[in-house]
């Protein structure tokens, strides 16, 4: 078998040599891809999840069919660069690590955001960093990096955040009793998000996340959008919090971050909100489910977590294996199923000339679970993340110039919640069934997840 050795002595599968020449898929394969990937992608919800369709597609493990089809596609055309004919024109699927690296390292200067993303996100967060280009992108990136402390291992308010997280986890466990699931995590992370971004005074402000959620549900319709009835009230509330920032909150840092009139500070905040509530709640719940279903991993985590110890922000930062568990949940079931880009100019990709206005697709649901490339594709491998902090195969937090500005903060929050939950008890995963000795499913319905709490004594 072709392969290479990792620093830990484990073998990483290497696929047979493939051409880097762009191939054109036939009409039948384009239709199959649309039915297997795009239809479920749209029905599940591009910006926030639809419970019914999440249930349907998790039931048939639809992403497993996507992975199998993409492997067949790559084998049939013997290429990592394949054109598909989809609605709106040709789309280029990029499978190779070198191709993905090139695209992400040249985003958004050459590879801007696709129309699907820009149109939908503009409905609830116009002028946001993630859909910006040119000088506006540079200005907004600098602002986001300053507030989110992107270049620091631990955020300057990390101790204050940790104290609040401990209090909220204790409060949540007091309320939920023996069994808990998605609704409990949703409430917990909304309260955490509100206090991290807006301060203690906002802890019970359910109106703000509710309005954002409604606008994100509307955005799932993408091209049938008018101005939301929630928009003005939502941004009015954000301006209120910005005008009177609370100590130890992200809004308290906003006035001191580099900005111009074009930064549009209020439009940067919704992205922080949904990333810290629905997205991070989903990933943290899945990570706890994985830990609970893998006894060896749980015991390794608990070696670093003494139930009688009240850990500090530095301790949380040192829990690298626990953070790896969170990263594995993100890898195994990426909440961002794909990264879609559009070439703003002509570009050369792996020796191929790519015309301007070409849609480019990086398919996380495939790249993260490609067993022909990754020896651990369908297993739980937190140790992988102990040495590899950036790998262009895995783009749940993106990579390159547009890597998530809040990556370190999001991982810190999720790890802190997991550490506090595990310090306070043990948990049995009741639903879904995850077997540590078998390949993990490609779909995970967070809405149906149930855990049983066994309190610490």
Whereabouts are the PLM-identified features?
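Conserved cytochrome P450 K-helix/beta-meander segment immediately N-terminal to the heme-binding cysteine loop
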Residues: 109, 362-388
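Cytochrome P450 heme-thiolate "Cys pocket" and heme-binding signature region
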Residues: 384-445
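Conserved cytochrome P450 catalytic core segment spanning the I/J/K helices
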Residues: 226-283, 298
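Cytochrome P450 catalytic domain signature, combining two hallmark sequence patches
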Residues: 101-120
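Cytochrome P450 catalytic-domain helical core, especially the substrate-recognition surface
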Residues: 2-4, 9-71, 117-245, 454-457
């Amino acid at each position: 078998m072709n392969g290479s050795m990792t620093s830990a002595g484990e073998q990483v599968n290497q696929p047979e040599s493939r051409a880097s020449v762009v191939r054109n898929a036939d009409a039948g394969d384009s239709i199959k891809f649309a039915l297997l990937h795009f239809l479920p992608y749209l029905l599940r919800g591009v910006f926030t999840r639809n419970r019914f369709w999440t249930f349907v597609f998790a039931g048939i493990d639809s992403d497993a069919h996507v992975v199998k089809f993409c492997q067949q596609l790559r084998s049939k055309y013997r290429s990592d660069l394949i054109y598909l004919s989809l609605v709106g024109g040709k789309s280029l699927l990029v499978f190779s690590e070198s191709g993905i690296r090139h695209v992400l390292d040249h985003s958004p200067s050459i590879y801007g955001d696709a129309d699907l993303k820009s149109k939908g996100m503009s409905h609830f967060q116009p002028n946001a960093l993630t859909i910006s280009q040119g000088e506006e992108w540079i200005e907004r990136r600098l602002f986001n990096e300053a507030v989110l402390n992107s270049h620091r291992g631990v955020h300057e308010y990390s101790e204050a955040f940790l104290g609040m997280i401990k209090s909220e986890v204790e409060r949540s466990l007091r309320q939920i009793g023996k069994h808990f699931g998605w609704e409990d995590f949703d409430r917990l992370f909304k309260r955490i998000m509100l206090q991290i971004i807006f301060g203690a005074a906002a802890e019970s402000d359910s109106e703000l996340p509710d309005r954002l959620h409604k606008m994100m549900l509307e955005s799932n319709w993408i091209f049938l959008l008018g101005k939301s009835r929630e928009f003005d009230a939502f941004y009015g509330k954000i301006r209120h919090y910005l005008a009177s920032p609370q100590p130890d909150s992200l809004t308290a840092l906003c006035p001191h971050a580099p900005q111009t009139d074009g930064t549009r500070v209020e439009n940067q905040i919704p992205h922080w909100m949904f990333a810290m509530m629905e997205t991070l709640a989903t990933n943290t719940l899945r990570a706890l489910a994985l830990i609970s279903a893998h006894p060896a991993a749980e015991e390794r985590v608990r070696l670093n977590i003494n139930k009688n110890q009240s850990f500090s922000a530095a301790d949380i930062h040192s829990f690298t294996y626990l953070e790896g568990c969170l990263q594995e949940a993100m890898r195994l079931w990426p909440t961002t199923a794909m990264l879609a880009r559009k070439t703003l100019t002509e570009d050369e990709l792996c020796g191929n000339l790519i015309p301007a206005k070409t849609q480019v697709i990086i398919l996380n649901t495939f790249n993260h679970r490609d067993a022909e490339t990754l020896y651990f594709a369908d297993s739980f491998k937190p140790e992988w993340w102990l040495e590899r902090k950036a790998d262009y195969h895995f783009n749940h937090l993106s990579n390159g110039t547009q890597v998530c500005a809040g990556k370190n903060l999001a991982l810190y929050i999720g790890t802190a919640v997991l550490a506090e939950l595990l310090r306070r008890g043990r948990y049995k995963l009741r639903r879904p069934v995850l077997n540590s000795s078998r390949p993990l499913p490609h779909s995970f319905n967070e809405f149906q997840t149930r855990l049983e709490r066994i309190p610490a004594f």
